[in-house]
């Protein structure tokens, strides 16, 4: 597959933009380097790059595009918003309408505030939790990404009762020491951390279903245990549902698992493809937010008519009866086919899937925590990724990321994808990767 124009554009981009990309996840560094593909247009389940190559897309912009690209109901809503002016700096009735839709879908959102990204949403829930509790520390889970604000760019210490260390240059040691990182799905580690630091902990921050080291579901009783342990220590529970809300059902993952947090951060899908974030929770907590309370948060673009219109339209599409069952059906076909081709070629894999999202790990372990996800073979994934790309299948360039199905994917798309999987595994087997466990 010729991608010479992408290569030329990437060379130019590197002279203009840091690293040639505007988000590190778009780089191909994690899959051996080279020029990322420069896309020119997208429609439904497909991308076309600047060289005219067509791809079936499972990146879905890292999750937001559940309706498929350029869904007409959403694009029409954005066009209407543009005609009326995309930014006012004043309240609009669209904000009321969208907030009401979110509250109806996720009842724990007793009050809501719109922001511009998932990073902002998580960052602000932490600030509000600190204001409410009068405490400074938070607990997060290893491998769970919560945006690029300083407080959550923290790696684990050497054990559950140790403070974190900066995971990025520019994050100060003092900030990192306000974060305790423990393994996902391990209540004993959380209990140990709370026993040690509990009186200083403002909140426990968790993805109710992990989306950032692949799709990983909580063990039975884990989230109930998180709530009990946190509340017994006087801490709040914050769910990061930036990836998970409206991904698996027309609600939050909290509705799917049957456990409610004190606060929730949202993003991605709720914007219909435009920049957005939102956070909300119990009234008594949310009343700590300015102008009612002392926790300040503001934003010029927050609640802008374009993002509100796109979000409303997206949720209207997702209310279609049977939509999530169909995503589940397609996901099951894809999972079954990938496993069958892997077995046929002797390639060792493990798949985690929930409805229309799945992750293929090159490991013989069932992945339930970040440590296991780390052991997925990056060399094998890199070869698989490149072979799939050359067969016209667009995946995220990272062994940790999920494949996201959209409502636009057809059975024919899945069959073509599985043909590409068969080819990729055959190449891997020919190179001896079937012998490497």
Swiss-Prot record:
<feature type="modified residue" description="N6-(pyridoxal phosphate)lysine">
    <location>
        <position position="268"/>
    </location>
</feature>
<keyword id="KW-0627">Porphyrin biosynthesis</keyword>
<comment type="subunit">
    <text>Homodimer.</text>
</comment>
<keyword id="KW-0663">Pyridoxal phosphate</keyword>
<dbReference type="InterPro" id="IPR004639">
    <property type="entry name" value="4pyrrol_synth_GluAld_NH2Trfase"/>
</dbReference>
<protein>
    <recommendedName>
        <fullName>Glutamate-1-semialdehyde 2,1-aminomutase 1</fullName>
        <ecNumber>5.4.3.8</ecNumber>
    </recommendedName>
</protein>
<dbReference type="InterPro" id="IPR015422">
    <property type="entry name" value="PyrdxlP-dep_Trfase_small"/>
</dbReference>
<dbReference type="Pfam" id="PF00202">
    <property type="entry name" value="Aminotran_3"/>
</dbReference>
<dbReference type="GO" id="GO:0006782">
    <property type="term" value="P:protoporphyrinogen IX biosynthetic process"/>
</dbReference>
<dbReference type="InterPro" id="IPR005814">
    <property type="entry name" value="Aminotrans_3"/>
</dbReference>
<dbReference type="InterPro" id="IPR015421">
    <property type="entry name" value="PyrdxlP-dep_Trfase_major"/>
</dbReference>
<comment type="similarity">
    <text>Belongs to the class-III pyridoxal-phosphate-dependent aminotransferase family. HemL subfamily.</text>
</comment>
<dbReference type="GO" id="GO:0008483">
    <property type="term" value="F:transaminase activity"/>
</dbReference>
<dbReference type="GO" id="GO:0042286">
    <property type="term" value="F:glutamate-1-semialdehyde 2,1-aminomutase activity"/>
</dbReference>
<keyword id="KW-0963">Cytoplasm</keyword>
<dbReference type="InterPro" id="IPR049704">
    <property type="entry name" value="Aminotrans_3_PPA_site"/>
</dbReference>
<dbReference type="GO" id="GO:0005737">
    <property type="term" value="C:cytoplasm"/>
</dbReference>
<keyword id="KW-0413">Isomerase</keyword>
<dbReference type="InterPro" id="IPR015424">
    <property type="entry name" value="PyrdxlP-dep_Trfase"/>
</dbReference>
<dbReference type="GO" id="GO:0030170">
    <property type="term" value="F:pyridoxal phosphate binding"/>
</dbReference>
<comment type="pathway">
    <text>Porphyrin-containing compound metabolism; protoporphyrin-IX biosynthesis; 5-aminolevulinate from L-glutamyl-tRNA(Glu): step 2/2.</text>
</comment>
